[in-house]
Amino acid sequence: MNNGSDGPTSAMGLFGGWAALERGYHAMTFDGPGQQAALFLQQLPFRHDWEAVLTPVVDAMVARPDVDPGRIALIGVSQAGYWVPRALAFEHRFAAAVADPGVVDVSTSWLEPLPGFMRAQLQDPSKKDAFDKEMGWTERFSRSTRATLHFRGEPYGVAGGSPFDLYQEVMRYRLGDEVKQVTTPLLITEPEDEQFWPGQSQALHDLLPGPRELVRFTAAEGASRHCEPMGLAVRDTRVFDWLDPHLRAGRVA
């Protein structure tokens, strides 16, 4: 189970861990680079090439006697909706996977609040000083913006430095042609009123060449918004109803 940008591993119990145990699965979660213990104790920042993280995780799992290497599933929540398909392009030992929600471009949630001229500045390295100056004025007049940039920037390894450099780093977190290499069956959630990456679940679904399914969640059933926080029972039921037959069949070699 792969967490997102800022949650503790304990939260993964709510986002599928307990439901997995109830169905007889074993469940494992971890802190990857930029996440909780890996960030605070080891000072390891995020990395966009998440296959470098998940491949060692799978190696550790298959070394255990209580793990069937042909029936390993992966659930990724929040920003892991980007990391999961990125890793699946290179790591093919999962029998099935879930992205909740699908994320094609992490940076859109950072870029959309900016005025157009500042987004244009980010496309031109010669405008770095101008961009940083604009952000400096924003941070001076808004303590909340300054605090948010520091909090959100720290996992990327560039907090407290140049805002231009921070945004450039976040803009690396975009899926490209590598998604054409994804062959693992993937379930993609699409919650109504997604706050951070609206429309990207459908976009990811349309990009993938292999078996995939888009599952929508609505406000009417109490399962709207990012990661369906008020409708976790509904979410878990659909996720594991989809995973069960894939894991019974096992990974196709």
Tell me the role of every PLM-derived stretch:
Residues 5-18, 200:
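The serine-hydrolase catalytic nucleophile loop
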Residues 20-37:
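Conserved alpha/beta-hydrolase
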Residues 44-70, 86:
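Alpha/beta-hydrolase active-site loop
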Residues 89-167, 190:
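Hydrolase active-site cap/lid region
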Residues 182-183, 188-190:
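Short beta-strand/loop motif that positions the catalytic acidic residue
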Residues 194-200:
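Conserved alpha/beta-hydrolase "acid-adjacent" motif
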Residues 205-224:
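Catalytic histidine neighborhood in serine/cysteine hydrolases
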Residues 218-220, 225-253:
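Catalytic active-site module of serine/aspartate enzymes centered on a nucleophile-bearing elbow/loop
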